[in-house]
């Protein structure tokens, strides 16, 4: 009897031939490995989903409010308000141009719900139309708090607040979080009491109304009224104010451009060159006078230290050329000695110098 051992390899004759669909050829493996090397390291799968928190209507309202403030500050800087009109403070100063995106002031919500007649559109068979359940990404509590904080800041700005302390924002965020937690608890309580609604993925109006009344004592229609009268009406009012301020600024800018063009047309280049020539002549004369005055002051200071010689007579003599005929009478000595008179440190004879200029 033949003994079979556990883990023994079968002989070559025992197994059949491998078909091409049972193995991968070596050449194909090499091509696949080269392709993987070219791709680089495999990227890890993104398990976190980024949810953009954006309310187009509130965001547009805040952006339009900022643009209106910028235009009003420019108008106050370059113009002076007199009654109901604005006048330029300096006609020669060009007002800067502003370029705001036109979509910032676009009307996102029309006055009519349907602008065109309703026509029949055949449905497309999709998971959404069939009502198949969808796997929604799980949002952590930290992301929810951050989202509520951003929403609270936007609603405060929409309400008219420009500055708010950190503690006030935190207090309002905590109050909103507690309200939503209680509201969802009331809503889930109604679903738990109805067996047929436990697996429902669609929001029902009756549970929402009961949960809202349990928390606030008012109907759920107050949310619609708030959106209509506070959010939507504020958006339209801010857009209307921005358009009015923009027209006023455009009027001032056109007035500034026309004033600059008028000043340019009235400007005469020949007169400007004459002004430059006159200013250059006056400056050269003043420079020459200052240089002559400095020279005379230096000369006057040196003669005043000589003792008995009068500074005015010496200057007049220098200017008239009298000093050239009398230079032969002046003698100099080196060191501390002198010839025929009291010597000074420079070696010049004061007696001869004195006799030359006195008459």
Swiss-Prot record:
Keyword Nucleus: yes
CC per GO annotation: nucleus; SAGA complex
Chief place of localization: nucleus
Gene3D superfamilies the record matches: Histone, subunit A (1.10.20.10)
CDD domains in the cross-refs: HFD_SUPT7L
MF annotations from Gene Ontology: protein heterodimerization activity; transcription coactivator activity
Compartmental location: Nucleus
InterPro entries, alphabetized: Histone-fold, SUPT7L
Keywords: Nucleus, Transcription, Transcription regulation
Subunit structure: Component of the Spt-Ada-Gcn5 acetyltransferase (SAGA) complex consisting of wda/Taf5L, Saf6, Taf9, Taf10b, Taf12, Ada1, Spt3, Spt7, Spt20, Sf3b3, Sf3b5, Nipped-A/Tra1, a histone acetyltransferase (HAT) module made up of Gcn5, Ada2b (Isoform B), Ada3 and Sgf29, and a deubiquitinase (DUB) module made up of not/nonstop, Sgf11 and e(y)2 tethered to SAGA by Atxn7. Interacts with Ada2b; the interaction is direct.
The protein's role, per its UniProt record: Component of the transcription regulatory complex SAGA, a multiprotein complex that activates transcription by remodeling chromatin and mediating histone acetylation and deubiquitination. The SAGA complex predominantly acetylates histone H3.
Protein name: SAGA complex subunit Spt7
Organism: Drosophila melanogaster
Gene: Spt7
